[in-house]
Amino acid sequence: MSTLNQAHCEACSAGAPQVSEAELPELLRQIPDWNIEVRDSVMQLEKVFLFKNFKFALAFTNAVGEIAEAEGHHPGLLTEWGKVTVTWWSHSIKGLHRNDFIMAARTDEVAAKAEGRK
């Protein structure tokens, strides 16, 4: 189990450092099954979660929204029938910060308790 899910996000402003190439492999090991996607030259973490129906997918989306609000760090969320795509990145630094890995780990924790997973 990752210790990332027990950490808290820190304030991240435009001058904050992105995760370094050296830190990236170790952080990724702590959040298996998350993928790095690059969109508009911005590195992002992304994972798809599958559910039995829309109701369960929506409940998971709302649960992720609650942890995002609590930490003041918000993902991209695409909720579809039986599927939620969660994307974490730090808008202010146009890339990945440790906060994104913390929140990915927290998302996995929410998913482990979510009803209706496939």
From Swiss-Prot:
NCBIfam families: PRK00823.1-1. CDD domains: PCD_DCoH_subfamily_a. InterPro entries: PCD_sf (IPR036428), Pterin-4-alpha-carb_dehyd (IPR050376), Pterin_deHydtase (IPR001533). The keyword Zinc-finger does not apply. This is Pterin-4-alpha-carbinolamine dehydratase. One of its GO terms (molecular function) is 4-alpha-hydroxytetrahydrobiopterin dehydratase activity. It comes from the Bacteria. Involved in tetrahydrobiopterin biosynthesis. Seems to both prevent the formation of 7-pterins and accelerate the formation of quinonoid-BH2. May also have a positive regulatory role in the expression of phhA. Its EC number is 4.2.1.96. Belongs to the pterin-4-alpha-carbinolamine dehydratase family. Signal peptide: none annotated. It comes from Pseudomonas syringae pv. tomato (strain ATCC BAA-871 / DC3000). Keywords: Lyase, Tetrahydrobiopterin biosynthesis. GO terms for biological process: tetrahydrobiopterin biosynthetic process. It catalyses: (4aS,6R)-4a-hydroxy-L-erythro-5,6,7,8-tetrahydrobiopterin = (6R)-L-erythro-6,7-dihydrobiopterin + H2O.
